[in-house]
Amino acid sequence: MNRRDMLKTVSAAIAGTSLLGMEALASNPHAGTSPAKKALIIGAHPDDPETGCGGTMLVLEKAGYEVVSVYMTKGEAGIPGKTHEESSAIRVAEATKASEMLGARPIFMTQIDGSTEINKERYVEMRELIAAEKPDVVFTHWPIDSHADHRVCSSLVYDAWRR
């Protein structure tokens, strides 16, 4: 099963399921009675936020959080046999649909799949995004992930969040 098929299967299963013993949060009677909190989920590629913490995103959304799904790239190199333009069009459409299913607002950044970079400009871009969104909680990749783009994303997010 490829990631695309897995995401479809998992999304269907999540729709009617509470996850990780988070029933109390998901059924929060105070949701909507206080200022909304915001969760920012930042992944390197389309599908990373959903496959990494889609269940948590859904539970937070049901608890009244504003959930924002940030994609550092548009998945340009994500589909073998497709051009970067074809692949990014498909992956952006999939991520947009997944965000809709999870009650999240998608944001697409400007890095290129497979060629992500850490430099002063990229730190500024991430810091400005986080400052503009003003999240209460941020989720991202594990810093020692096997995928280079995931490690870049984690480093940028961690350093931007600390400042």
Where are these regions (language model features)?
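Proline-aspartate-enriched helix->loop->beta-strand connector
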Residues: L129-I130, K134-I144
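Active-site rim/loop-helix segments in enzyme catalytic domains that contact anionic ligands
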Residues: R3-L19, A26-E133, R162-R163
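Short Gly/Thr/Asp-enriched flexible loops that form oxyanion-binding sites at enzyme active sites
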Residues: A148-W161
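Histidine-centered divalent metal-coordination motifs
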Residues: H45, H141, H147
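Short, well-ordered, mixed-charge alpha-helical segments that flank or form enzyme active sites
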Residues: E117, S146-A148
